[in-house]
Amino acid sequence: MDVGIINYNGGEELTACVKSLLAQTVPVRVLVFDNASTDNSIQNLKKQNLNCFIIENGENLGYAGACNGLLENMNADIQVLCNMDLEFDPTWAEKLLNCFDRHPEAGSVASLVMEKSGVVNAVGVQFGADLFAKNEASGLNIAEADIREKEVFGCYGAVMSFRKVAAEAAGKMDASFFLFFEETEWYFRHNLAGFKTVFCPEAKVYHERSMTTVRYSPRKLFYSERNRLRTAVRLLPMSDVFKLPFRGFVRYLSMAKGGVPGQSGDGKKLSKISICKALAKAWLQALWMLPNELRVRKEYHRKFENASLKARKILDAYSLNA
């Protein structure tokens, strides 16, 4: 098993993450891809003299770019991409490999990502009609969540475990997404290529950062919405694409009724104007990128038979309203 960590200013959390992987009950090969960090996380890691392969990049390629860089340096049949702010249960790799053995039909196995308090980060992913994605069971106590071993849409982006053959069939992540929704678009391609994901509740990973650190942010909103729209144009039936403005407006209205938070996850003041600007920028950029997305759509429809029909079935199978 090869495990690749994406690092950007990970501080001491990076070293802790590497140590938890090297402490597994089965051997794993650990790689670290540094996205031009400005802190001392890589220097501190080197001082520990740990058995890991470090790739230092001169510029920040974003999450997807770093994932692609790691994939180019991985050779194992089972591969993992993950954030640096994680701590892996000592039996995680063993449980994960056992699940892969039990499910030879699965291209990926999703871990149970949770806080040490027992709050779940994600079990799977569910979708709204406009491709709005929500992590299944996010924020629930583990006693309240459905954590049966079951088929899910794909892995939570914090830690993705997959067979090499599945990643090769899906192709590279789209580095132009930079942040957010890139793993969702990628896992649509996994599904379209015929590779399913099984959720393994025994494979436990602890997410050290509270989810609130990234929950409300105009920057996150911009990238999430822009990349959601780009993915919708690439994959959904055109009848659904034409409905995106209306469905998006309905969702924004529903969210607005719930109230706008007073501050973002990093404690900065958050205004309705900043949210509206982020949404407007996302839609304008998505519109500007439309010619490119239509070209990608043609490529996907050539590569994956009945791509739009299959994408529609995926939405129905993992619907928020199910």
Language-model features: where?
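Active-site-adjacent helix/loop segment of glycosyltransferases
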Residues: 4, 193, 197-294, 312
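Short, acidic, metal-binding catalytic loop of nucleotide-sugar glycosyltransferases
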Residues: 19-28
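A conserved acidic beta->alpha catalytic loop
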Residues: 20, 34-43, 59
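Glycine-rich, basic loop-to-helix element that forms the pyrophosphate-binding segment
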Residues: 56-74, 84
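Short aromatic/hydrophobic "clamp" motif used to bind/position activated sugar donors
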Residues: 79
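Conserved donor NDP-sugar-binding/catalytic core segment of glycosyltransferases
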Residues: 87-128
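Short, flexible, basic/aromatic active-site loop/helix in glycosyltransferases
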Residues: 129-152
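A short, conserved alpha-helix in the catalytic core of glycosyltransferases
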Residues: 153-204
